[in-house]
Amino acid sequence: MPLHQLGDKPLTFPSPNSAMENGLDHTPPSRRASPGTPLSPGSLRSAAHSPLDTSKQPLCQLWAEKHGARGTHEVRYVSAGQSVACGWWAFAPPCLQVLNTPKGILFFLCAAAFLQGMTVNGFINTVITSLERRYDLHSYQSGLIASSYDIAACLCLTFVSYFGGSGHKPRWLGWGVLLMGTGSLVFALPHFTAGRYEVELDAGVRTCPANPGAVCADSTSGLSRYQLVFMLGQFLHGVGATPLYTLGVTYLDENVKSSCSPVYIAIFYTAAILGPAAGYLIGGALLNIYTEMGRRTELTTESPLWVGAWWVGFLGSGAAAFFTAVPILGYPRQLPGSQRYAVMRAAEMHQLKDSSRGEASNPDFGKTIRDLPLSIWLLLKNPTFILLCLAGATEATLITGMSTFSPKFLESQFSLSASEAATLFGYLVVPAGGGGTFLGGFFVNKLRLRGSAVIKFCLFCTVVSLLGILVFSLHCPSVPMAGVTASYGGSLLPEGHLNLTAPCNAACSCQPEHYSPVCGSDGLMYFSLCHAGCPAATETNVDGQKVYRDCSCIPQNLSSGFGHATAGKCTSTCQRKPLLLVFIFVVIFFTFLSSIPALTATLRCVRDPQRSFALGIQWIVVRILGGIPGPIAFGWVIDKACLLWQDQCGQQGSCLVYQNSAMSRYILIMGLLYKVLGVLFFAIACFLYKPLSESSDGLETCLPSQSSAPDSATDSQLQSSV
């Protein structure tokens, strides 16, 4: 493949006035070129045919005729480097060049984003409970493991986005994917170094009478030290994923036409959202396999001591990341024909009021550490960018908070098991989140939204989701639980008067450490078999569930003559379930519908040399103000709705029973607060946005409309590749 050679210095087209003052002929270069010799963007004369030889007419000519010389001050063509061929250093065979297109790099970036979402947001969330059980971790320790990803990203975002933005983006991306794969392998390492998982079954703690010493046995296994290994794996995940959502997005955006960019970015983010869905499905299936594969056990998947094969998914994702990184490392600094799209983006940038924009227009700007303070200062002076960052932080707070605790909300409201609630939430997120993300980019492209119109679209989506949040004013009644919300006789219990001990189970010596709810034949839910007064005798009914007979705390049934209990929670008969699910779907859909338009607006309101750095700064703001505190804030208010806390040998554990009405009320308050802030930030951003040109749509007409047949053919090929 012929390589296009360019000089070390960028070529700047001067304005007509400056050209006249210097005595230069400002006739368009294409008119001075010899007939039949195509002119390559970035050079005055073409010495050879190349993939970049796409036009004989300068891209800025029609723009200058329509808007005057002001537009030409901003047009600079930057050197694309020594080669636009796809390959690894000197090895660039012609057969690889079929992948050297925007669609080719989009495929591999989607694969990387899918793996990142599947591992970090899928596998990690799925196996957290298993890790706590297997390695004796407390909840705050597992929370610190999850937060290590965001901590790593915040530490690396400034460095990666600033220097990677002016560097070789595919190489930054490829090495980042390799780091992600390494992090997955490190995360799975404790399974092979901690020894076998062996447990002893003791049914004495479950039934009446209980064995008091069976639960709080002193354990000094030292397995909790593996927390540091898990944190290291997550830290590598965070470092490796940092280039993906900053440099990856800008690399896609700068190599396609501005009208097609939202679609490409939407496909990229859709893959990132489908990744967690696959992670939940694959991770859930792997947890049904015993962690010590090949060894028989008496444990069942319903047992609180069961640990599934949590580590298999990380081995698979790590290997897949290594295979994905290799082709990404082979892509050039710029794809063939990409420079012609720089002119399209120039007039959509937010207009600055001083001369500092001239320095930012220098193609060498942002390549040294000396430019870092000015880069930050230029972004801080851009009110549209700041407001979009704040709006993104409010949306991130809701997304991270609700994605973390929505399964718990569904579990409490509809009396579901943890696996059922997670599966139901996954069914909501896949079409709502994935569909909203893709359609957001599709609408921006289909409606040809530019500038403030994109921000108005984000404002509309936020208002609709704000109205949908009002559904949390509804709630399902809590299932009555003996000793918590109802007395053992069935009457309502005043709030705050908890008493799990009654005359019917006083002689059972029930332990509060073992929570294993059962549903009595009287419609009440009991803390455990022991608290229901059930002896060890069992039988299996037609549905495969264990039924416990002769329970002393359950009133006798006239038909059967004795009270009995069934393992598991009582089912909910809430009639509002369909309505709640529909409106939760609406909130998720419109929240994700605005994500790609908001990202597009961010890319358009800053200058080309700063776009990667701007995305990095935005991600830092979003994570610090939204991603990290979001789950903490939602967890804090949800804990306020707790009625019964777990007693772990004298220490307070997790919440076991929530008050549904209070949980809905607190989520409603949090949702309204952050959605109102999001509406305000988008509205003010739309009001303050001032593009460099009155009509950014006119940039599309800057492309050559009249050219020779060979150039037209080349232009058609470039557009078809986009």
Swiss-Prot record:
Tissue specificity annotation: Widely expressed. Expressed in placental trophoblasts. Expressed in pancreas, kidney, skeletal muscle, liver, lung, brain, heart, colon, small intestine, ovary, testis, prostate, thymus and spleen. In testis, primarily localized to Leydig cells.
GO biological process, alphabetically ordered: monoatomic ion transport; sodium-independent organic anion transport
Kazal-like domain: residues covered: 498-555
Catalytic activity: 3,3',5-triiodo-L-thyronine(out) + L-glutamate(in) = 3,3',5-triiodo-L-thyronine(in) + L-glutamate(out); L-thyroxine(out) + L-glutamate(in) = L-thyroxine(in) + L-glutamate(out); estrone 3-sulfate(out) + L-glutamate(in) = estrone 3-sulfate(in) + L-glutamate(out); taurocholate(out) + L-glutamate(in) = taurocholate(in) + L-glutamate(out)
Cysteine disulfide links: 504-534, 510-530, 519-553
Sequence ranges on the Cytoplasmic membrane side: 1-103, 165-170, 254-272, 333-378, 445-448, 604-612, 690-722
Localization: Cell membrane
Residue numbers bearing the Phosphothreonine modification: 37
Family: Belongs to the organo anion transporter (TC 2.A.60) family.
Protein name per Swiss-Prot or TrEMBL: Solute carrier organic anion transporter family member 4A1
